[in-house]
Amino acid sequence: FFNQPIFEKFLRSEAIKHNNIDIKLGYKLTNIDAQESINNLTLLNINNEENEYITSNYVLACDGANSFVRKALNIESFDYKCDQDWVVVDYQVDDKYKINTDRYQICDYKRPTTIVPITGQHVRWEFKVNPDDNLETLEDEKNIRKMMKPHLWRLNPEIPLHSGKLLRSSAYTFHGLLAKNFKFNNCFLLGDAAHQMPPFLGQGLCQGIKDSYNLCWKLSGVMNNIFNKEILNTYSLERKGIVDFVIKGAMKQGDIIGSQDWLTATLRDIYLNVASYIPKLLKPLKFQKPWKIKNGMIDNDLFPNDVNGVIIPHPSLDIKVDNKLFD
């Protein structure tokens, strides 16, 4: 796990080091005309409310769950209909307490809870919202600490209830959505603009990073006249299947954790208790890996085998004493 705000700050600090990157803050995209070979974009300067017009050969839309680009291009999304309301809390433990870094997903039908130590003393808590909760008061510090109380010992039994700092708390509706296509002409959707998933596998940002890894080396090859432009069509083909698999896995995990029906939760608990003695029973509940690319550049007909398209770790190689990544 990593701290997402720190990671995003690092990305921005690295981006400003490159002269070929123009970072425009305080602008809003208000129109996009995505033609077959050129894109015309209108940007609104928030400060002086003046428009700026730019053209580009390619657009990579990383504009989040409410993506303007996705809506403007009329790209529809498939809804997995798995919405759940949760309160997400960032909690900073006092430095004098050493915390247990194990992650917990607590199957308590009265209040399903997730505890994830991220980096340092930073801990992410997630509490499922009950039907009779008042959202206006649920996020109050008093109520947050009340929900933390039964599980705080898991971090360290010595941590007092009112110690530490609540950095933020916010109610979210967890969605499962997948754009029906990640590409329109020379525009591409990446990250939450292309897909949204419940957080139970910690894969939201990770899948966005995988989007960029899949697309950018291909785009670089096309722009440098190394690859035929047709290679860009493989981006959506390769990524959609894997993201669909991850979303379904996260939904399954969420159903296990988040059940608030007494009978269902009781049967689940009995099953898990029995499975603790018969580990094979846990296999259907585990996140199935490896992820496999079944479409796109992989020719499963020409090279039919079990490992074709399987994603492997990204090693580094010593090439003339220069440590470089495999690609």
PLM regions with names:
Residues 41, 124-125, 189-190:
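Short beta-strand motif preference
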Residues 11, 61, 166-253, 320, ...:
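Conserved mid-domain beta->alpha element of the FAD-binding
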Residues 42-46, 92:
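A generic structural motif
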Residues 9, 13-18, 221-327:
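Helical substrate-recognition/capping region of FAD-dependent monooxygenase/halogenase enzymes
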Residues 48-58:
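Core beta-strand elements of the Rossmann-like FAD/NAD(P) dinucleotide-binding domain
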Residues 2-24, 29:
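Helical element adjacent to the flavin cofactor pocket in flavoenzyme catalytic cores
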